[in-house]
Amino acid sequence: MTKILLNTASTVLTRLWKLSLLGLVFAVAAATLVSSRIPTTLEEVKSSGKLIVISRNGPTTYYEGPAGHTGFEYVMAKAFAKHLGVDLEVREIEDLGEMLDKVGTKAGHLAASGLTVTEKRARKVLFAEPYLQVTQQLIYRSGESKPETIEDLYGKRVMVISNSSHSERLKELQREYRDLAWEEQHDVDMLDLLEMVHNGKIDYTIVDSNAYQINRPVYPKATVAFDISEPQDLAWAFPQQKDASLYNEAQKFFKDIKQTGAIDDAMETFYGHLGEIDYSGAILFAHRLQSRLPKWETHLKAAAEKNDLDWQLLAALSYQESHWNPKAKSPTGVRGFMMLTLNTAKEVGVKNRLNAEQSIYGGARYFKSLHGRLPERIKEPDRTWLALAAYNIGLGHLEDARILTEHFGGNPDKWADVKQQLPLLAKRKYYKFTKHGYARGWEAVDYVQNIRNFHTIIAWNEIENQRLQQLAQNENHVSDYAQFSPTVTEAVKSISGTSSL
């Protein structure tokens, strides 16, 4: 009996041991499965601490501005990275076809490059919530016969960027208009094509409405003929795969920024009116000499004297920046009377950028610093004009333009030569070889010219202010220009680009 009991106990213990061992095996296996589970893309991004975005360096995507990297796509991608709690890394791929092929690979988690949602592209990638609608616009040269229909393109030289939504649209139109022909180039950008139309090298091109709006001041003869498409969505591109974790998070992100209005602020910053100076703006400046300048004249003179500057030049610079508004604020981050970035304010010791006196003294110190950091061999007045350009576009971009100037046989120390090359910083075939990349170089040229003209008017105003007041009261004058002396009249005309009344 005892033997039977011992055998039974042994059998039970053996079974319990086997069950325990089996349980341990299952536990280890389960732990192994959990530890070996492939993380989602979203988890991978968060654990690595970095979001990699594919884009193109350019005016509607991202570029290096005076305050650092900027551009609509860059700002949105930066906000998404912040939403995820990670850093942003932008990687450039210039060819649009290659860009879409590499979405979701090691090249990048997503593509944010002003991509138009098309049927063909939607078969390759997964598009997120659209953030903007654009139309494709046919561009022709002002002064030439304006095309009214697609048939008007027959026999003409039409050029577009290869692998673009514009080439897709032309292929769609060709099904109905069989005689439609065009050229595709992969080594040109939108600004190149606008220049070709402007100079009459090609008859027509196609650009997106948002891109045209940003760049129309550069080549004013390149004009819209008509919309060649219905409104189309722009969106970010994600890979088509089962793991949609990052895509879903992006959908939540866009929903949030639309509700908070953050996306509207970005739209206004990058796609709002460019602020070209026209006749009315020039006249407004002339009147603000009387209404605003006197309030700040004492501070401007003191700051200029302390930094060995021309106070009238400092006044002209500050008007160009803020219109003498101490509370001026830009969505890009510059603020105050001298529109200082946060980093620049810290550099020159400004604690409150909205304090006009601090801003004036800080702006004067910053301009003096830029003036002094230029090569010693540069003489006046070129030194001042180049320093003004640096205040607008940054020393890095200015140096890029000076290198280009020397490359093309010009004098990098002469403003007259450098200003000819500054617009090249907006053209891919040039800026892709520069250290600091894309910049809206033509704006720096206009910026300096405006300040020089403002300076002329302020200098004249200092001498003949009383006479101007008397002339302004004369009811017999037939135009606003006639309220001022010939000197002021010509300066105002120069600013506004008006040659006759």
UniProtKB/Swiss-Prot annotation:
Glycosyltransferase keyword on record: no
Annotated spans, LT domain: 275-501
Keyword Signal annotated: yes
Membrane-related topology note: Peripheral membrane protein
A GO cellular component annotation in the UniProt record: cell outer membrane
Reactions that this protein is recorded to catalyse: Exolytic cleavage of the (1->4)-beta-glycosidic linkage between N-acetylmuramic acid (MurNAc) and N-acetylglucosamine (GlcNAc) residues in peptidoglycan, from either the reducing or the non-reducing ends of the peptidoglycan chains, with concomitant formation of a 1,6-anhydrobond in the MurNAc residue
Main location: membrane
Annotated InterPro entries: Lysozyme-like_dom_sf, MltF, Solute-binding_3/MltF_N, Transglycosylase_SLT_dom_1
Active site: E321
Gene3D superfamilies tied to this protein: 1.10.530.10, Periplasmic binding protein-like II
Annotated signal sequence range: 1-29
Region (Non-LT domain): 30-274
Any single GO BP term: peptidoglycan catabolic process
EC numbers: 4.2.2.n1
Intracellular or extracellular location(s): Cell outer membrane
Key words, A-Z: Cell outer membrane, Cell wall biogenesis/degradation, Lyase, Membrane, Signal
Domain remarks: The N-terminal domain does not have lytic activity and probably modulates enzymatic activity. The C-terminal domain is the catalytic active domain.
NCBIfam families, alphabetized: PRK10859.1
Family to which the UniProt record says this protein belongs: In the N-terminal section; belongs to the bacterial solute-binding protein 3 family.
Name of the protein in its database record: Membrane-bound lytic murein transglycosylase F
Organism expressing this protein natively: Saccharophagus degradans (strain 2-40 / ATCC 43961 / DSM 17024)
